[in-house]
Amino acid sequence: MGKSSNIVFDRIKEERQMLSFFKIFQRADLSSDCMRALPYSFISKVSEKDFSYKMVIRAQWGKTWDVEVSKNPTYYYIETRGWDLFVSDNALGQNEFITFTHRGNMVFHVNIYEQNGLEMRKPRKFQTMGPSSGIKKEEGENSLIDVKKEEESDESPGRAEFLVRKKKTEDSKSSKKKMTRNKVKKKSKSKSKQVLDGVPEFKITIRKSYLKFLAIPKHFVDDHIPNKSKIFTIRHPNGGSWKVLCLVREIRTIFSGGYSKLAREFPLMVGDKCTFKLIKPFEFVLLTSKKNREKMDQCMID
């Protein structure tokens, strides 16, 4: 007991003599420029000998993440690719308090403290999937309740709307259904024309908070999203794409890291009707309706 206490004390004493900084990982701000920035008061004290644009983040259980450091005219910051992997691997975003202690040569040891104040000493376990159901029964029942609530309130502005179409493969199709599919294909004027009718999709009306992060409907998550946080590609129908972190949580799943950049550059506006089509296992094409936007612009002109 006494020996263990001395080891902890010696570690704290040693780390107090090293340069360090902390960050609080909030769900809506996981990959913002501010979140990835290295504090000026910290970076100004790192010697030229110790500094490198190659940075290593090391957890207590030994896992490491290689990240790139870049510089703009104002500050140094961590590139999103390695940062988002660190965030997703540790399922961060629940107001964790994390210290970054510089051990030299841009190697940082991190200590992760959960919202309850306890230190995380081993990686979080992601929810396990059953061989047939694809998700634990209890979580599936909760998902149904959440979706029902969304469906009951979808008349209010900004509420998530949900639609999943399953591809029909039967040979004996009625001529009426074939005509309907042909009409849908003719209406498509972009790259989405290559997407067959029946691909999984969900619809969202953009509200203010959805310019920072986006909650994905539960039914869609259960049917089409893996049970572990992953990086997805979201494409513009006219070209261009963004890497976005799909952060999986027991309560809900969201697009977080990289999503706010997508919202700025696409661009998305409050009131836009958006359709996310899952064209590949980890790739969406995003379609938007500009009717509301055109009305808003017209009102401003008038």
From Swiss-Prot:
Its main location: nucleus. One of its GO terms (cellular component) is nucleus. The keyword Transmembrane does not apply. It is found in: Nucleus. Residues 175-192 have a biased composition (Basic residues). Residues 123-192 are annotated as: Disordered. It holds the Pfam family B3. Signal peptide: none annotated. Gene3D superfamilies: DNA-binding pseudobarrel domain. GO terms for molecular function: DNA binding. It comes from the Eukaryota. Keywords: DNA-binding, Nucleus, Repeat, Transcription, Transcription regulation. Residues 21-116, 199-292 bind DNA. The keyword Transcription regulation applies. This is B3 domain-containing protein At3g17010. InterPro entries: B3_DNA-bd (IPR003340), DNA-bd_pseudobarrel_sf (IPR015300), REM_fam (IPR039218). CDD domains: B3_DNA (cd10017). Residues 135-174 have a biased composition (Basic and acidic residues).
